[in-house]
């Protein structure tokens, strides 16, 4: 096989269905329509998939432009195996509510952890107070 360097290897994947994981944790699924030398992507018929436990929900997003530096993972979806998932699809409202509850639970657990460490004389700096320079 003759492999092309860099993002040129993605040319073969144009017009195929892909899953894209972003740095902020979002998961996008759509058809790859265009790429450039910086790995910027244009996805068509895109949905944002939200997973909570064994359930998932899809939020339609349409055409989606993704800046290359925000892509963590890009993978082609096998259309034959796509429907063979153990996950249950639920409505957008239901999955958003479950996601909110999950995030609230994580936040409360993090606060408890920080308080416990503080009581023992330890402290962990919060991520939002750190400089990213």
Curated annotation (Swiss-Prot):
Keyword flag Cytoplasm: yes
PTM sites of type Phosphothreonine: 129
Subcellular location: Cytoplasm; Cytoplasm, P-body
Main location: cytoplasm
Homology family: Belongs to the snRNP Sm proteins family.
Assembly and binders: Interacts with SLBP; interaction with SLBP occurs when histone mRNA is being rapidly degraded during the S phase. LSm subunits form a heteromer with a donut shape.
Keyword Ribosomal protein: no
GO biological process annotation, one example: histone mRNA catabolic process
CDD domains in the record: LSm1
Alphabetically ordered keywords of this record: Cytoplasm, mRNA processing, mRNA splicing, Phosphoprotein, Ribonucleoprotein, RNA-binding
Modification Phosphoserine occurs at: 123
Start and end residues of each Sm domain: 5-80
Function according to Swiss-Prot or TrEMBL: Plays a role in the degradation of histone mRNAs, the only eukaryotic mRNAs that are not polyadenylated. Probably also part of an LSm subunits-containing complex involved in the general process of mRNA degradation.
Species whose genome carries this gene: Mus musculus (Mouse)
Name of this chain's protein: U6 snRNA-associated Sm-like protein LSm1
Listed GO CC annotations: cytoplasm; nucleus; P-body; ribonucleoprotein complex
Molecular-function GO term, any one: RNA binding
């Amino acid at each position: 096989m003759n492999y092309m360097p860099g993002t040129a290897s993605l040319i073969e994947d144009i017009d195929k269905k892909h899953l894209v994981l972003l740095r902020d944790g979002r998961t996008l699924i759509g058809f790859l329509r265009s790429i450039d030398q910086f790995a910027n992507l244009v996805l068509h018929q895109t949905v944002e998939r939200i997973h909570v436990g064994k359930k998932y929900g899809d939020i339609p997003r349409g055409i989606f432009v993704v800046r290359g530096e925000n892509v963590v993972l890009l993978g082609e979806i096998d259309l034959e195996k796509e429907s063979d998932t153990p996950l249950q699809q639920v409505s957008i409202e239901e999955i958003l509510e479950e996601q909110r509850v999950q995030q609230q639970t994580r936040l409360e657990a993090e606060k408890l952890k920080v308080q416990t460490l503080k009581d023992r004389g330890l402290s962990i700096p919060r991520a939002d107070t750190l400089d990213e320079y």
